[in-house]
């Protein structure tokens, strides 16, 4: 975009299955999705999606991909059945076949009884379900879902995530899901790609990436600050939230070092266990390594990035 490089030296391979696309606001996620859909042309480089060239075969790519955009792409004056049917016709489906499929997919996404209502009367959850129906009418091999659970209440969100899970586990489809809701990504996706300033910051299996920095969680009673200072003085890496501390599990001696420090400062450890990191934890650790001070993913995913100007490393952890 003019002098600004939205994507730079981005080299990655995404395999079949479910992949979460993550990154701060302005990281290049939308540009990446539009590029692989063939909607915009990359100024350099090359790529393929399902074996099709992103530069010359955009129409072929879009015929095999279902795209559920974040923005409102529905006609409020159309009945859901005709909106979904129209999506099929845009993809070249016979009108009779498109109508038959529209009934099927609207039933699948839970709108079978509401299919003749105008979309303008739908709730946010029903509109999201309609967009999902539009994206799968042609039975695509890959579904790109951009913020699929955004703005949904708990019930609608659960239904959306369960439906995407079912598509991956039982429908033999691949899903690429961009979302700021880490719990949703972790439930649906096995793999993740994290973009930062248009570059690849991390890629791999979520479980493998979470295992890079294992931690021991301790619940402390008495002299918590002294214990924190003592552990840090001998080189242990500590994250603290009140009386709960997480210590980087560097080797087999870490536990004994923690206990020795607690004894020295007369602090009681009421509980100690291996901490099971979440995708949220992983995201924060990676972004902190890139120079940002964050408390939650919301700080970066839904608001402008502020922090030191640090270039993303070429690659971090995991498999492709």
Spell out what each predicted region is.
Residues 77, 220, 248, 272-273:
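Active-site-adjacent beta-strand anchor residues
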Residues 2, 114, 124, 223, ...:
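Structured loop/turn residues at secondary-structure junctions
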Residues 110, 235-239, 268-273:
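A short linear hydrophobic-aromatic micro-motif
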Residues 1-196, 202:
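ABC transporter nucleotide-binding domains
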Residues 250-320:
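C-terminal coupling/interaction segments
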């Amino acid at each position: 975009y003019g002098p600004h490089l939205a994507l730079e030296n981005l080299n990655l391979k995404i395999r079949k299955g479910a992949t979460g696309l993550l990154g701060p606001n302005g990281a290049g996620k939308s540009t990446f999705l539009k590029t692989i859909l063939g909607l915009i042309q990359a100024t350099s480089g090359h790529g393929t999606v399902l074996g099709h060239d992103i530069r010359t075969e955009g129409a072929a790519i879009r015929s095999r991909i279902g795209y559920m955009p974040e923005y409102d792409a529905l006609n409020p004056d159309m009945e859901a059945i005709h909106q979904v049917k129209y999506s099929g016709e845009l993809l070249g489906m016979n009108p009779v076949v498109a109508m038959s499929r529209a009934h099927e997919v609207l039933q699948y996404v839970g709108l079978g009884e509401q299919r003749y209502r105008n979309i303008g009367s739908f709730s946010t959850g029903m509109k999201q379900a309609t967009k999902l129906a539009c994206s799968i009418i042609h039975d695509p091999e890959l579904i790109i879902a951009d913020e699929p659970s955004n703005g949904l209440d708990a019930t609608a969100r659960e239904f959306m995530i369960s439906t995407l899970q079912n598509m991956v586990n039982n429908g033999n489809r691949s899903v690429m899901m961009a979302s700021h809701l880490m719990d949703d990504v972790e439930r649906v996706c096995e793999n993740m790609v994290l973009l930062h300033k248009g570059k690849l910051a991390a890629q791999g299996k979520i479980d493998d990436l979470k295992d890079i920095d294992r931690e021991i969680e301790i619940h402390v009673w008495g002299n918590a600050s002294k214990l924190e200072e003592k552990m840090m003085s001998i080189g242990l890496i500590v994250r603290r939230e009140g009386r709960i501390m997480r210590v980087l599990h560097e080797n087999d001696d870490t536990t004994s070092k923690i206990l020795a420090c607690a004894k020295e400062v007369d602090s009681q450890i009421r509980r100690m266990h291996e901490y099971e990191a979440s995708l949220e934890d992983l995201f924060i650790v990676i972004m902190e390594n890139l120079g940002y001070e964050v408390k939650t993913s919301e700080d970066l995913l839904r608001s402008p990035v502020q922090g030191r100007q640090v270039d993303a490393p070429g690659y971090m952890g995991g498999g492709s």
